Amino acid sequence: MNGPALLKCICDETRFEILELLQKDNELCVNDYVEKLKKDQPLISHHLKTLKQCGIVKSREEGKKAMYSISNLQLSTLISTVTKTSNKIPTLCNDENSC
């Protein structure tokens, strides 16, 4: 996967929130995301499917649950770096629709 394709996969706000949680918690199931992100289960499942198709997350079965985790250490490091860097950049535009 090239850089722009990777960024396209993670640029959605919900997908990035999922990855931030995974970066901190290592492994979660769909219900964990629903509870922590306060978003509907079908939406979370859709975004996890997209992240899995991109190769960014992997899943394993644990009983009736699918447990999701970031697929490799470099991706976890990337998510951490993006989060830390974005927190240090001043907000230049308060209207995200016009930026």
Tell where the protein language model's regions lie, with residue ranges:
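Conserved alpha-helical interface elements of two-component signaling phosphotransfer modules
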Residues: 42
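N-terminal helix-turn-helix DNA-binding core of bacterial DNA-binding proteins
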Residues: 2-39, 65-74
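Amphipathic alpha-helical dimerization/coiled-coil segments
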Residues: 1-2, 24, 72-99
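Beta-hairpin "wing" of winged helix-turn-helix
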Residues: 52-62, 69
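Short, hydrophobic-biased segments on the C-terminal half of alpha helices
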Residues: 19, 48-49
